[in-house]
């Protein structure tokens, strides 16, 4: 009974407060109070109205202009494309050098930075002692375009390599090239791993896949034939480019030439430790000089 009485009193008290607040002089409209009422309403917080489709389109265009280089037209931005691509490829090549993939050697072409020549050495497994030359071609809209293409020259006998063209199935490992996530050194690493872990699912060379699954001895024979063919064509360049990798027979005369070049390069002043004394920790002070000394004028 006491609880019911308390609740009734509470309701009456709240209703009385509502009546007082509604009848307060601040809410009454009186002559000359229009300015105060407008100022009171202007202080209230209100959400902005939703923009119309036309307004939203205008806002998006404004944001796009702010993000683009100031004062640059699309033609001007496009003109810088080759420089952006060049710096991107330089960064990719530096990443490749830092990875130091064993048995993989790559050199960009002299005529185009979008073409890289390379060779892979295989030291164990079914393809042991294999030396496979390849050419990797990078799309012009890299890194926003498709995957690079990698072609073995000469072609090799492998389930994921086209027997006619020598092209590696790069999309098997990179279905969609993702900027800042996928890198060129990963493509080269994948090209090396296919010789150690052979995947015969969805092959580019069905004959090689079927033979690998059902007749390993016959598969090994075909691989040995492939190795001999690649060894016989090592002296041939994959393209007419000064940077295309090719092998030459090492004769005693050529060996002496290489040895002399190494000796001469080590004897040059820039190769000596004193050439970079500030980097090696050597003192730059003159012999006999004192610390904090000053010549008298």
Swiss-Prot record:
This is Protein AKTIP homolog. Residues 17-42 have a biased composition (Basic and acidic residues). The lineage of its organism: Eukaryota, Metazoa, Cnidaria, Anthozoa, Hexacorallia. It comes from Nematostella vectensis. InterPro entries: Ub_conjugating_enzyme, UBQ-conjugat_E2_core, UBQ-conjugating_enzyme/RWD. Gene3D superfamilies: Ubiquitin Conjugating Enzyme. Residues 13-75 are annotated as: Disordered. Residues 59-75 have a biased composition (Polar residues). Residues 84-232 form the UBC core domain. It comes from the Eukaryota. Belongs to the ubiquitin-conjugating enzyme family. FTS subfamily.
């Amino acid at each position: 009974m006491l609880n019911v009485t308390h609740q009734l009193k509470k309701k009456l008290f709240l209703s009385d407060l509502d009546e007082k607040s509604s009848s307060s002089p601040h809410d009454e409209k009186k002559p000359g109070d229009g300015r105060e009422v407008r100022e009171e309403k202007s202080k209230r917080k209100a959400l902005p109205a939703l923009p119309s489709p036309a307004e939203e389109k205008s806002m998006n265009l404004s944001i796009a202009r702010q993000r683009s280089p100031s004062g640059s037209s699309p033609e001007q931005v496009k003109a810088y494309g080759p420089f952006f691509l060049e710096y991107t490829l330089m960064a990719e090549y530096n990443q490749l050098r830092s990875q130091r993939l064993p048995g993989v050697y790559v050199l960009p072409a002299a005529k185009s930075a979008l073409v890289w020549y390379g060779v892979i050495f295989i030291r164990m497994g079914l393809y042991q002692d294999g030396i496979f030359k390849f050419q990797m071609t990078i799309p012009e809209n890299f890194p926003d375009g498709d995957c690079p293409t990698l072609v073995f020259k000469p072609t090799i006998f492998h389930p994921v390599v086209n027997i006619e063209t020598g092209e590696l199935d790069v999309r098997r490992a990179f279905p969609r090239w993702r900027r800042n996530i996928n890198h060129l050194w990963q493509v080269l690493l994948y090209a090396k791993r296919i010789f150690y872990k052979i995947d015969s699912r969805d092959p580019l060379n069905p004959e090689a896949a079927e033979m690998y699954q059902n007749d390993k001895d016959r598969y090994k024979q075909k691989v040995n034939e492939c190795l001999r063919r690649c060894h016989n064509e090592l002296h041939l360049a994959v393209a007419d480019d000064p940077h295309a990798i090719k092998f030459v027979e090492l004769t005693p005369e050529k060996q002496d030439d290489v040895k002399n070049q190494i000796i001469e390069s080590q004897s040059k002043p820039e190769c000596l430790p004193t050439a970079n004394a500030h980097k090696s920790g050597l003192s730059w002070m003159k012999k006999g000089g004192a610390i904090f000394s000053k010549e008298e004028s």
